[in-house]
Structure formats: structure tokens, C-alpha cells
Amino acid sequence: MSLNVPSRRLLKSAPSSANALVPALQSLSINTRSIHTTPSQQWSLFGWGKQKVEERNKVKEELKQSELARTRKPTQEEIFERVRGRLEGDSIFADTTPSSQLAAEQDKHKDWATASAEKKLAAAHAKDQTPTGISLKKDHLVRVVDPDPRSRVRWERKMVIRKLQRGTDPWSVEPKAERIARTERKLVYKTGYLPTSVKKLVHLSRQIRGKTVSEALVQMQFSKKKMAKEVKTELLRAEAKAIVTRGMGLGKAAAAAAQKETGAEPVKIQTKDGKHLEIRDPTRIYVAETFVNKGFTRGVELDYRARGRVFKMNKPTTTMTVVLKEEKTRIREHQERVAKKLRQGPWVHLPDRPVTSQRQFYSW
């Protein structure tokens, strides 16, 4: 049989000597109760996550010191020391390579580059080369200017044989086309794509046809058409190309000197359109032919109409081709027309022709 009695009741019923132990027991009970009221950070599962108080205090102290060092303003002596340390060395490579050694290496490199450039220039002047070392000899450039030399040699041999045969044959006559190509000059120039239509550009094309280049330029200068300025620019380009590449229009001074010495009158001709001209310079350039061609469509514009209909309007481009010739050609054509007219003889009202289509009855 057991007896359950509270400890406080036993202590109160104990003698005075036992009463002296009550405060100690109370403090013991308080301390034992404080075990359950400690922070949860001091406790962990199976000993994981335990930190000693000293380590935590050490970490806190380090963080506090770093924060103070970051927020503290530098003193004037520290600022001077930083600036002086930056300006002491010659360069960022002062520890590894002295400045004198770097300067010597740079001078050496400059001398080598200068000598190499002078050597290349001397070799170019001496051996017909460009400064980059490209040879300018004909043998080296044969594949550029003469891609198929064997075919060229065969064609030249064929042309020489043909010329000798025709020159030694008393019955051979030079073809008319070859004679014209040998004695007269011509240039065919095609403009770029102009932002206009064929119907609009054809009027300017007809306006300059048959006129000299100077007259055509004047017509385009005072024309109200939008494309007149473009046509004028293209005419100037065509004239410059004819002078440079074909040697056209360079006999004005020679013709004037010859007329002054001999006192010859200017040549009077009549064009196929019936216009009479006086030609003082046979090398003067004129516009022999002009024609226009349709180009690509440069854009599309929508035309909105009634009842929800939409029409597509194309924006066209057009090119114009100009054929430039010298006045020698017009003189020859005039002479050919006059000779043909003389060969035909006078017109006969009732020529003597044989009777044809005879029948047994009258056909009138």
C-alpha cells in the first residue's frame, strides 16, 4: 500500500530545521521550470545546428567591424596615400617591363615597319608591281585581260587571212557594213530605270531625236516635263562616254582650220525628214535614234472605288536607249539618197511596158 502526499504539505508539517530548506527547494523548482522556457534556438534534433556562444559572438564582432570600416570616411592622409600610389609607376606594366625597354621596342618596331614599306615601294617601282605586291606584267595578267588566248589567236589569224584574201582579190569588194564600221563612229547608250511610264517618256524621246546634243540639252533644260531633267543628265553622260571611249566630237578645231585655209563652204544637206542643215564640223555629235523600253514594276498603289471595290495601280519604270553618231553619217546618207535619185532617171507618165494578162474580151 502506497501513500501519495504532496511535498509542500510534508515540508510545512516538518520541524523548523526543515523549514530552512524551503527557499532552496523553491529556487530549485524555479530553475527546473526554466528548463522548459529556454529559447528553441538552443535545442536541435540529434545535436544538429548547435553553435557555440563564442563563435556567434565572434561572427557578430566581425560583421560589426566590417560595417564600421565601410561606413567610416577616409582621412586626408589615406586619400593622399592612394593618389600617390596610383601616380608612382610609369604604366600598369611598370613592375614587369621598364618604360625605357618599352620605348626601345616601339622604336625598333617603327624602324622595321618603315623599312618594310620602303622595300615594298622600291620593289613595286622596279618590278612593275603595286604597293600591295600585285604584279602588273602582261604575262601575269593574261588571265584577266585575255581569258581564252587560244581562241583569240585563232580569231586573229582568221581575220588576217580574210583581209589578205579580199585585198589581193581584184574582184572582191569591201562590204558596206564593214566600210561604215571602219570609217564612222557610233555609241549606243542605255539609261537606267527612270520612275515614269513609256507613254510619258516617249514624248521626250521623240523631241530630242534628230537633233544635235547641244540642241537636245537646250530642249530638255526648258522643258516642263518632270523627266526632262533626268533625260538631260543621261544625255550628258552619253556624250561624255562617246568622247572618252569612241573619240567622237574631237575634230571641231581641225575642221575650222581646214575651212580657214581652203575657204571651203559648209556642207549643205537635207535630212530624210526634209530639214535642210549646214554642217561645218563633220565630227559633231547628234542623236541618231532614240527608243524607250518598259522596265520592272517599282510598286503598287491601291485605288479605292465605290461599292467596296479596289483597283491595283502599278508604278512603272522605263529605260531610254540613245544612239549617238557623227555628222559624217548624215552626210553619207544624204549623198546616198541623191545618188539613188539620179540613178532612177526622170519620171515617165506612160512608160513603154509589155502588154500582159491578155484575154478574149475587154476588162474595162
UniProtKB/Swiss-Prot annotation:
**Which InterPro entries would you find in this protein's record?**
Ribosomal_uL22 (IPR001063), Ribosomal_uL22_bac/org-type (IPR047867), Ribosomal_uL22_sf (IPR036394)
Q: Identify the stretch annotated as signal peptide in this record.
A: none
The membrane-spanning stretches of this chain are none
Which keywords does this chain's UniProt record carry?
Answer: Mitochondrion, Ribonucleoprotein, Ribosomal protein
UniProt GO molecular function: structural constituent of ribosome
In which compartments does the protein localize? Mitochondrion
Q: Which GO terms describe its cellular component?
A: large ribosomal subunit; mitochondrion
- Biological process terms in GO annotation: translation
Q: Which family does it belong to?
A: Belongs to the universal ribosomal protein uL22 family.
Describe the protein's quaternary organization and the partners it interacts with: Component of the mitochondrial large ribosomal subunit (mt-LSU). Mature N.crassa 74S mitochondrial ribosomes consist of a small (37S) and a large (54S) subunit. The 37S small subunit contains a 16S ribosomal RNA (16S mt-rRNA) and 32 different proteins. The 54S large subunit contains a 23S rRNA (23S mt-rRNA) and 42 different proteins. uL22m forms the wall of the exit tunnel.
Describe its function: Component of the mitochondrial ribosome (mitoribosome), a dedicated translation machinery responsible for the synthesis of mitochondrial genome-encoded proteins, including at least some of the essential transmembrane subunits of the mitochondrial respiratory chain. The mitoribosomes are attached to the mitochondrial inner membrane and translation products are cotranslationally integrated into the membrane.
By what name is this protein known? Large ribosomal subunit protein uL22m
To which species is this protein native? Neurospora crassa (strain ATCC 24698 / 74-OR23-1A / CBS 708.71 / DSM 1257 / FGSC 987)
Taxonomic path:
Eukaryota, Fungi, Dikarya, Ascomycota, Pezizomycotina
Report which gene this protein is encoded by.
mrpl22
